[in-house]
A protein has these predicted regions:
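Glycine-rich phosphate-binding loop and adjoining helix at the ATP-binding site
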Residues: 12-75, 81-83, 99-126, 269-274
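ATP-binding/phosphotransfer module of carbohydrate and carboxylate kinases, centering on a glycine-rich
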Residues: 1-5, 45-48, 72-73, 121, ...
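Glycine-rich beta-alpha junction loops
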Residues: 9-11, 87-91, 121, 261
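Short glycine-aspartate micro-motif
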Residues: 3-7, 56-58, 82-86, 92, ...
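Short beta-strand-to-turn element immediately C-terminal to the catalytic PLP-Schiff-base lysine
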Residues: 94-98
Length: 287
């Protein structure tokens, strides 16, 4: 080993030394004492304390890392545009932008720069009652609203809140409704599994419910994941239109995606593909 690379998936400020100064925590992670710490320098110090040889450390956000790893596998003459995306515990996107369009740089120069968009922090998005309830009880109310609608850390809780609302609206038999209203937690993995197969037993509260109730619950969950897919496609479409790419059917724009939610969810990936086809390909002829 001659050097170490770290993917860091929290807000940070890059330094000239290729390190990253932590700016904050997201995705309900709550730590103290992180302010102004350098990820690479702290790791190097700890490794040296444990007797390891000192090695150069480079820290990069996980989304640009996904972009770079994906772009190395695609021939330049194949893709007409490229973007990186992470859909896991959190959500984010990145893309190449002309340097002169990046206002914070204030440079009238040629060339492009890979920009970490931190799209999960987008807040100008319509919220449902479920979104507002989740946001109010989160570690950072009012922040990262887009992430709270589209990422694995929150889709389970959104599904739980939607199921309780459906129970209160009389969509289930009384006994099933009571059990759902008593449901304290629901993970995105269990919600996804149940939404894909109502007979899988992933939600214990619905284990002995009637078939009709289980199917109704699955439809509610599918709606939550389906809305997330629409939001994700809107995010991708924004990059397509911003970069004015994806106009050639035979040289499509490529989006490199990583993250546990996109990789393992049964519901999300096909829903995203369906929405991409309907919105970008069929409606806007972008490929």
């Amino acid at each position: 080993v001659t050097q170490i690379g770290i993917c860091f998936s929290y807000p940070a400020e890059n330094t000239p030394e290729l390190d990253a100064k932590v700016l904050g925590m997201t995705k309900e992670v709550q730590l103290t004492g992180w302010e102004d710490h350098l990820v690479g320098a702290d790791l190097a110090e700890e490794l040296e304390r444990r007797g390891c040889t000192k090695l150069p450390i480079t820290v990069i956000n996980d989304t640009p890392a996904t972009y770079l790893s994906g772009s190395t596998t695609i021939a330049n003459n194949y893709a007409n545009g490229f973007a990186g995306r992470v859909n896991g515990t959190g959500t984010n996107t990145c893309c190449l932008l002309p340097v002169r369009t990046i206002e914070k740089l204030g440079r009238d120069a040629d060339g492009e720069m890979l920009v970490n968009l931190e799209s999960g922090s987008f807040t100008d998005v319509p919220q449902s009652a479920f979104d507002k309830a989740l946001d109010a009880t989160s570690a950072a109310p009012g922040a990262y609203r887009f992430e709270k609608m589209t990422s694995g850390r929150y889709l389970g809780e959104l599904s739980r809140l939607a199921l309780i609302a459906a129970a209160n609206d009389g969509l289930f038999a009384p006994e099933t409704a009571d059990k759902l209203c008593a449901l304290d937690t629901l993970s995105a993995a269990d919600a996804d599994a149940f939404g894909a197969d109502p007979d899988c037993g992933a939600i214990a509260a619905l284990g002995d419910a009637a078939d009709a109730d289980r199917k109704t619950a699955a439809m509610v969950i599918q709606g939550v994941f389906g809305r997330a897919a629409k939001a994700i496609v809107a995010n991708i479409a924004a990059i397509v239109f911003l970069t004015d790419g994806a106009k050639n059917r035979y040289r499509p724009m490529v989006v490199a995606v990583d993250g546990s939610l996109f990789r393992y969810s049964t519901l999300l990936r096909p829903a995203v593909s369906e929405e991409l086809e309907a919105f970008l390909v069929q409606k806007h002829q972008r490929y």
